[in-house]
Every structure is written in C-alpha cells, then in structure tokens.
Amino acid sequence: MELVEETIPKEGKKMGERIVVDKAYLYQEDKPLTVCKTSLFYTGDGFAAYDCRGDIIFRVDSYGPDTRDNDEIVLMDATGKCLLTVKRKRPTLHQRWEGFLGERSEGQKPIFSVRRSSIIGRCTMEVEVYDGTGEEYIIDGDFSQRSCLIYDTKKCTVAEIKRKVDASTNVMLGRDVFTLEIKPGFDGAFAMGLVVVLDQINGDDPVEIGDEQVHPFVED
C-alpha cells in the first residue's frame, strides 16, 4: 500500500497531496468509487458515487431532461452540502468549463478549468489548477466508453475511469454504472468534479443493447 508522504511543506500540504476542493477526500490507498447515473432510479439525470460499503460519497442532482442543457452544475456530499460548482464558460470553441469552490457567487474566481485540447473530434482534455502551484493534468481516453486516465505532467496517473465488472458474475455492467478509482493523495472531490465536466463535454453514445444495469452493491 502506498502511503501519503509525511513531510509537510510551508504551505501546509503534505508532500504528494493534491488538494483542490476538500482535503477530507484524500485517501492513503487506492479508493474505488462506484458511480451511477441516477436516471436509473429517479426522474432526471445526475450522478451518485458510492464506496465499497454502499455508502454514498458524492451526488449530482439534475431535474432537467438533459444535463447537457445546463450551464452550471453542483457537486454535493452525501448530506447535500455543496462542495463544488462547475460552470460552462461561454463563448468558447474548446468547450471550456470552470470549477468554483462551494456554491458559486457572482464575481468568484475559479479554482480550476477544463478544456478540450482540440476543437475537432475526440481529443485529450487539459486541466489547469489556479492555486499558485501551476499544476496541470491531462485526461486521456473516451469518457463515453468509460475509459479514461487522468495524469499529471510527470505522467503519473492520479485517477482512472473504467467500466465496472460485477465480481460475482464477471459480467461487465452498462455504461450507466462505472468505476472512478482515485489514487493515493489525490483529491477525490476534484476527481468527481472532472467526471461531471467530462459528462457534459463528451456526453454519451447510445447505450448498447444488452448493457447490464444494476443498483450499486456492497463489495466483499
């Protein structure tokens, strides 16, 4: 198990920690979350993220018929507290989105931005963090297929989005249920915020016939 480095620099962060939204969502080992499209169970379209015990960690509520009509989306914790607001920046050719700490207020400055690296076709996403460190991340892969790596400028993977396999049956579940695996020391709330943005930018291809759809389950 990889542990978070204990040396504490002047700015108060431990070495290896990447806090963008909330330090409460830093983990000292790989943290897999089961992420579900809430349209499976409720009216509207949003997300719910569960840990391996079945406890809800994050939620994103949307009551419109299509979340891609929304210019502003809120990421909440299990109690409904607003952790992060992501907002589409207009006009932009690169589909830029910005993230704001908590519930966004007029004139508030963003803490990060996400943009397509190209205006043509599927491409990588570029993430820039505005905390004075100059941190940048790349999102590589195809979110519509639930296959993405998020890595830093040193090519170290900090989070991964992948299809979920039912451990008991070895059946790959449908794309409305997938895994977000957060690496040690990376901000899980930030990672979930990036999932929300990816869903807005890339959207979903039509779900293939035969995709399994199930409620999140408790893992052994």
Curated annotation (Swiss-Prot):
Function: Might be related to the phospholipid scramblase and tubby-like superfamily of membrane tethered transcription factors.
Entry superkingdom: Eukaryota
GO cellular component, one term: cytosol
Pfam assignment, any one: LOR
Protein name: Protein LURP-one-related 12
Family to which this protein belongs: Belongs to the LOR family.
